[in-house]
Amino acid sequence: MPGKIAVEVAYALPKKQYLQRVTLQEGATVEEAIRASGLLELRTDIDLTENKVGIYSRPAKLSDSVHDGDRVEIYRPLIADPKELRRQRAEKSANK
């Protein structure tokens, strides 16, 4: 008989962070952890078809299993291309 595991689910905004602790059955998935956390109801801007997820900063799939003590992270979409921003900063500093 599978036991219980404790998992944290995190979602960070620039000025507010959400960290929910959930208890799940062993063998639960990333998606089950997110749904159990209640964050989808709290934050309507989270869309699991769009937002990427990870476990301790490593990319994960919604179907991946979680383990006791894991921290599932929901990532916000990038609003700008990092390469483009670096290029713009380099141009700006070169023009000074």
Swiss-Prot record:
Gene3D superfamilies: RnfH-like (3.10.20.280). It holds the Pfam family Ub-RnfH. InterPro entries: Mopterin_synth/thiamin_S_b (IPR016155), RnfH (IPR005346), RnfH_sf (IPR037021). PANTHER family: UPF0125 PROTEIN RATB. Belongs to the UPF0125 (RnfH) family. This is UPF0125 protein YfjF. It comes from Escherichia coli O157:H7. The gene is yfjF.
